[in-house]
């Protein structure tokens, strides 16, 4: 199986390569085989990309917002038209089941381009009456922005970062994760086909040194990163040393709280979505599932029953519900945490094994796993695993569960399942998390902001909040009379 792109990088409207770059193999997670070989960006490639962005950005910013938006909406239409091909690329790159990538990856990127392509035309400054004189504000582009993606939703993240940046008149240099480099190249081609001028969206591949080279470059005005907390800290430190704007969408260990009066099937469905979708590799996952004591045993019994029915296998098979983890390293990490959970005394209710699948012996598969009897101090309840490992914790009262839910360095997301809506709103108001759901989980429409509190990030993706973060505000005072001066 092969998925070799035309070249490794997309700069100034064309594919380029540099044979001096370090090899960057693309591994199909279902089999462990190499399906493409790319090259990491050299300093020369980085300079070409940043210079292309710098040169193209001013003319782009001078266009009317509606003109910029028209190109983004055209790109959204192309994304939707090619969804089947893009879903296959994403499945080969990430290992996620094709039934997921068909509905959750390129479609989300398309929604994002469409939303910002329309919203930017009405995103204006304001006028202020000062009783004779007046003032007004302008939202202006920052310049060259850098996007650094993660491997769980490659094309979605590329869309989430590039759409608001481009809509506001910026240029972007985007570095995908070295694990999943393919779909960002496809997005770059689509932008060009939609009429985006050359140099405004460039893709460069590479490891951490390439990201550091982009973040530290003097021309770059803003950095947006999706990744782990340790990665975010490094990037923020480097960006802050040069006073660059920064958006950090980082990790989590989010609480999902199920009260006694919840619809138990809906709550279980939310918990499964919040732990097993994308093989558990979602930053906002509700991996600490707090279940009130009155329904705890019944919840666990039904949860285990439903979890055992999840179909694991060939991710290109439309009937498969869960594919492999993204890489050997991630597989070793997740399996290691399952072992830690057992050692720490958690009860393995189901899963926890590496399945034997005919034809996929080299794949990075693991069964969806449920631990019960988990305490707040166990490592599986405190550290981000980023795999299909759910911890179920029992609680008695509302105040208790709020305190326990907030006892974490993270604050990306939280969820509450209950039929008592006043209680739902009351609890959500007390939870220290940036993105919350009531009687749902992990739904992230582009119209609402997405991001976290505490160590889970800075800034927001999506919604009008993202346009604000890809722009800078200029204030203009206009005098209509004489200048009052004592000199």
Curated annotation (Swiss-Prot):
Its cofactor is K(+). Keywords: Metal-binding, NAD, NADP, Oxidation, Oxidoreductase, Potassium. K(+) 2 binds at residues 454, 457. Coiled coil: none annotated. NAD(+) binds at residues 149-151, 175-178, 228-231, 251, 283, 384. The active site is at 161 (charge relay system), 249 (proton acceptor), 283 (nucleophile), 461 (charge relay system). GO terms for biological process: glycine betaine biosynthetic process from choline. GO terms for molecular function: betaine-aldehyde dehydrogenase (NAD+) activity; metal ion binding. The keyword Metal-binding applies. The modification Cysteine sulfenic acid (-SOH) is found at residue 283. It catalyses: betaine aldehyde + NAD(+) + H2O = glycine betaine + NADH + 2 H(+). Its EC number is 1.2.1.8. PROSITE patterns: ALDEHYDE_DEHYDR_CYS, ALDEHYDE_DEHYDR_GLU. Binds 2 potassium ions per subunit. InterPro entries: Ald_DH/histidinol_DH, Ald_DH_C, Ald_DH_CS_CYS, Ald_DH_CS_GLU, Ald_DH_N, Aldehyde_DH_dom, BADH. K(+) 1 binds at residues 27, 93. Pathway: Amine and polyamine biosynthesis; betaine biosynthesis via choline pathway; betaine from betaine aldehyde: step 1/1. Dimer of dimers. PANTHER family: ALDEHYDE DEHYDROGENASE-RELATED. Belongs to the aldehyde dehydrogenase family. Involved in the biosynthesis of the osmoprotectant glycine betaine. Catalyzes the irreversible oxidation of betaine aldehyde to the corresponding acid. HAMAP family: BADH. This is Betaine aldehyde dehydrogenase. It comes from Mesorhizobium japonicum (strain LMG 29417 / CECT 9101 / MAFF 303099) (Mesorhizobium loti (strain MAFF 303099)).
């Amino acid at each position: 199986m092969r998925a070799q792109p035309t070249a490794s990088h997309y700069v100034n409207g064309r594919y380029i390569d540099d044979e001096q770059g370090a090899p960057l193999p693309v591994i199909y997670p279902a089999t462990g085989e190499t399906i493409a070989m790319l090259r990491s960006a050299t300093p020369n490639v980085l300079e070409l990309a940043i210079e292309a962005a710098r040169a193209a950005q001013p003319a782009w910013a001078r266009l009317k917002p509606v003109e910029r938006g028209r190109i983004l909406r055209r790109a959204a239409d192309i994304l939707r038209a090619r969804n089947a091909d893009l879903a296959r690329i994403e499945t080969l790159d990430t290992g996620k089941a094709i039934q997921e990538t068909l509905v959750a990856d390129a479609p989300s990127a398309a929604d994002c381009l469409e939303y910002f392509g329309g919203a930017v035309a009405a995103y204006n400054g304001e006028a202020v009456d000062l009783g004779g004189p007046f003032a007004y504000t302008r939202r202006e582009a920052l310049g060259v922005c850098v996007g650094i993606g993660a491997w769980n939703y490659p094309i979605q993240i590329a869309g989430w970062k590039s759409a608001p940046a481009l809509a506001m008149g910026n240029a972007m240099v985007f570095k995908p994760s070295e694990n999943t480099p393919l779909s960002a190249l496809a997005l770059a081609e689509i932008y060009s086909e939609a009429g985006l001028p050359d140099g405004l969206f460039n893709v460069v591949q590479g490891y951490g040194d390439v990201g550091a080279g982009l973040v530290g470059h003097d021309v770059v005005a803003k950095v947006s990163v999706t990744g782990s907390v340790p990665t975010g800290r490094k990037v923020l430190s480097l960006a802050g040393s040069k006073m660059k704007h920064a958006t950090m969408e980082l990790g989590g260990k989010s609480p999902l709280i199920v009260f006694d009066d919840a619809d138990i099937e809906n709550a279980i469905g939310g918990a499964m979505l919040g732990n097993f979708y994308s093989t558990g590799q979602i930053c906002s996952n509700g991996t600490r599932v707090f279940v009130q004591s009155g329904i705890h045993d019944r919840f666990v019994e039904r949860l285990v029953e439903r979890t055992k029915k999840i179909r694991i296998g060939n991710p290109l098979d439309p009937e498969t519900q869960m594919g492999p983890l993204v890489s050997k390293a991630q597989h070793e990490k997740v399996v290691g945490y399952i072992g830690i959970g057992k050692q720490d005394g958690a009860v393995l209710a189901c899963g926890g094994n590496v399945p034997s699948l005919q034809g996929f012996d080299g794949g990075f598969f693991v069964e969806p796993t449920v631990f019960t009897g988990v305490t707040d101090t166990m490592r599986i309840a405190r550290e981000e695993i980023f795999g299909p490992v759910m911890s179920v914790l029992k609680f008695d009262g509302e105040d208790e569960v709020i305190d326990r839910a907030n006892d974490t360095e993270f604050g990306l997301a939280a969820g509450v399942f209950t039929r008592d809506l006043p209680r739902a709103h009351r609890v959500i108001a007390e939870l220290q998390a940036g993105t919350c759901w009531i009687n749902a989980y992990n739904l992230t429409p582009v119209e609402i902001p997405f991001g976290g509190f505490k160590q889970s990030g800075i800034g927001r993706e999506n919604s009008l909040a993202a346009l604000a973060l890809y722009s800078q505000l200029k204030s203009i005072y206009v005098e209509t009379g004489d200048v009052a001066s004592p000199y």
